[in-house]
Amino acid sequence: MNFPFNGSVFHHTEKGDNKLTYSSSMYKRLERVIVKHPKEAFINQEHLSKEWKKFNYLEEPNFNEAVSEYGEFISILENYVPQIDYLPASTEVGMDSLYAHDPVKLTSAGALILKSGKKLRQTEAEAYKEYLREKEIPIIGELTGDAVSDGGDIIWLDDKTIAVGRGYRTNDEAIKQLKEMTADLVDEFIVVQLPHDQGEEECLHLMSFISMVDHNLAVVYSRLMPVFFRQLLIERGIQLIEVPEDEYHTLGCNVLALAPRVCMMVSGNENTKQQLEEAGAKVYEYKGQEISVKGTGGPTCLTSPVIRN
């Protein structure tokens, strides 16, 4: 696989107080990312056999295949992202910890520690907190009390606009606290009511039906999208790539921007890929049957962007 990467180092944006600016974007050039290898999350086949039903996977993942797929996934990331940080194995967390996006959300000032709406994932927040401290990534806030939210329900439309999905994984108390914690960082805080869809046990996030690929390009599954939100995107001048129903179910709507109009997705979503290419995007694919489709977590779920510039 050939990558148009010249090996140059990308420079972080500095603020006047000489602090790093962290990620408040879904599409700018990805410079630093946190991931978790399936060797650390899935552990081994025996562990998967015991756990996959409890965590509501579609089927039992094949451990060796998962490791192989992840190698391909990481090789694409490595050609664009100068710094990839790996979460360590932990006996405190489960196999869903492969999806490093959900326990935390980065803002321009640092990290917000979340508490998953999926009870089995709530221990991930504490493990993540320790890791961020070790890496000296500032933590600017943490959900408390009854608040629950997943990172997959929080998207940056631009540096100053945040949209949060209100569904089974993110509740009103979390939205209240997130508003307070981001008050000095955003100009617009948009609450998007999510549909019941397949029910409480299924994982429907705001990011299930929208992926930003550039400031004016998004991959969407409009059938699940509230009318006001779809209209808002169009009014903001964002071109919508419409994912067909069959490809929605194979994670065609889950697209990770490595840079504006440079992205990666699970292979096999040909219609969506073609539309992206027609919009001028470079698309990389990885075989994600074990690490993505079976756990319904695409490339945006597998990654937690720390710095984008």
Predicted feature residues:
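The feature marks the mature, well-folded catalytic cores of soluble enzymes
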Residues: 3-309
